[in-house]
Amino acid sequence: MSAVSMLQGEMLARGGAVIARGASLATARNFSRTTVPMAKIRKERDTFGELEVPADKYYGAQTARSQMNFKIGGPEERMPIPVIHAFGILKKAAALVNTEFGLDKKLADAISQAADEVVDGKLDEHFPLVTWQTGSGTQSNMNVNEVISNRAIEILGGELGSKKPVHPNDHVNMSQSSNDTFPTAMHIAVGREVNSRLLPALKKLRTALHNKAEEFKDIIKIGRTHTQDAVPLTLGQEFSAYVTQLDNSIARVESTLPRLYQLAAGGTAVGTGLNTRKGFAEKVAATVSELTGLPFVTAPNKFEALAAHDALVEVHGALNTVAVSFMKIGNDIRFLGSGPRCGLGELSLPENEPGSSIMPGKVNPTQCEAITMVAAQVMGNQVAVSVGGSNGHFELNVFKPLIVRNVLQSTRLLADSAVSFTDHCVDGIVANKDNIAKIMRESLMLVTALNPHIGYDNAAKIAKTAHKNGTTLVQEAVKLGILTEEQFAQWVKPENMLGPK
């Protein structure tokens, strides 16, 4: 059965199901007279035989066959578009280089033009395949080859599906294998997304947190360890920790890029470079670098580049650490902003939308909730990427689509949530100075300043007695005869407790 016939059958089945769920008899009779228009088709062939494909699509038989064999997840599970666009970059680079090794320039120019349209997103609708296919990504590589081939044929005035004058394997896939093109596209896609989306977003959040650390540098508050009262610090010092977490996150991500920039192209089937020419790998990497503006190079060992994806596992390890930082920062700000009257209430967070369908006036820390949910998703993706990376069997890793899907999702979610958290939360945070001061004055841990003067045991006695009696530190210190009010006022000054003496 062709892909078109199957689609028509599913449409009819869905229509029948609607009738069965309660449509009137009149409606049912009316439906029975409705004719579903037949989509125009053309016939294409692969090594398994002939298949019908939609006439208005550039893909061919191998793509249609994959649609038939891998009905897993539907449109939501399609191969990530950044991978498709990365393939366009690679196919253009290969065509340009292959002109040095026998590819007719006229064909190369048509392939290059079609590949540009892939990169620009003009042909996105022609890439229907899902992530859950062969672990090498062969079907997606052929999807790209077929689309570029047919579009190039169209550019040259030929007949779609004829494979003349541009053949998907012989010309678009010249000097290539799915085993080296898919990992190359993986690296290009992730490299572009990290540089264009993630790093700018992290730097934006870092700047916003730094601005708040400066704004809050003179606000003294009580610290908390184990969620219990501790000694004072400034709110600026507290936020400076978040700034450093972002600094380190950016540095960690950037430190993974040298391995990510190594491309498998030129390794072909198992890493030996069979069916390529000397210099092809280096020239393709240099051309990809020129097209992307990123410092891609050929992988020094193609066997590793095909059989293992440690570089992407490493990238996601850095992303996972970013997620860990996001979870901590989001939770801290959420809890510091709890209230407004019965929580900590040290921070006021921007009020962006109503928070409850039943409690009037309630507003929630939704940006904190969103960024911590993103963090949880990325942590889950870390498991999937680790499992995928560990499944390189002999000369080929066969979890490639899963790996790149999760790395790209984590990259996108972290980037978008960082921007959202910055714009709709961090930039609008206000310190509640009066409440911060009130909480600090009530803390028993200010007694720590007395350790050098009266010793740990006496200081502990004052704190425990004050806690038991519900009194203040100074009241119990004087009552116990350990020191005077003047001594207490002289020695217990929060502003003198913010660093080494």
Swiss-Prot record:
Keyword annotations: Cytoplasm, Lyase, Mitochondrion, Transit peptide, Tricarboxylic acid cycle
InterPro entries linked: Fum_hydII (IPR005677), Fumarase/histidase_N (IPR024083), Fumarase_C_C (IPR018951), Fumarate_lyase_CS (IPR020557), Fumarate_lyase_fam (IPR000362), Fumarate_lyase_N (IPR022761), L-Aspartase-like (IPR008948)
UniProt GO cellular component terms: mitochondrial matrix; mitochondrion
Residues flagged as site, Important for catalytic activity: E369
Pfam families: FumaraseC_C, Lyase_1
Annotated active site: H226 (proton donor/acceptor), S356
Source taxon at top rank: Eukaryota
EC numbers on record: 4.2.1.2
Metabolic or biological pathway, per its Swiss-Prot or TrEMBL entry: Carbohydrate metabolism; tricarboxylic acid cycle; (S)-malate from fumarate: step 1/1
Quaternary assembly: Homotetramer.
Miscellaneous comment text of the record: There are 2 substrate-binding sites: the catalytic A site, and the non-catalytic B site that may play a role in the transfer of substrate or product between the active site and the solvent. Alternatively, the B site may bind allosteric effectors.
Described purpose of this protein according to its UniProt entry: Catalyzes the reversible stereospecific interconversion of fumarate to L-malate. In mitochondrion, catalyzes the hydration of fumarate to L-malate in the tricarboxylic acid (TCA) cycle to facilitate a transition step in the production of energy in the form of NADH.
Protein known as: Probable fumarate hydratase, mitochondrial
Species the sequence originates in: Caenorhabditis elegans
Biological classification of the source: Eukaryota, Metazoa, Ecdysozoa, Nematoda, Chromadorea
Gene: fum-1
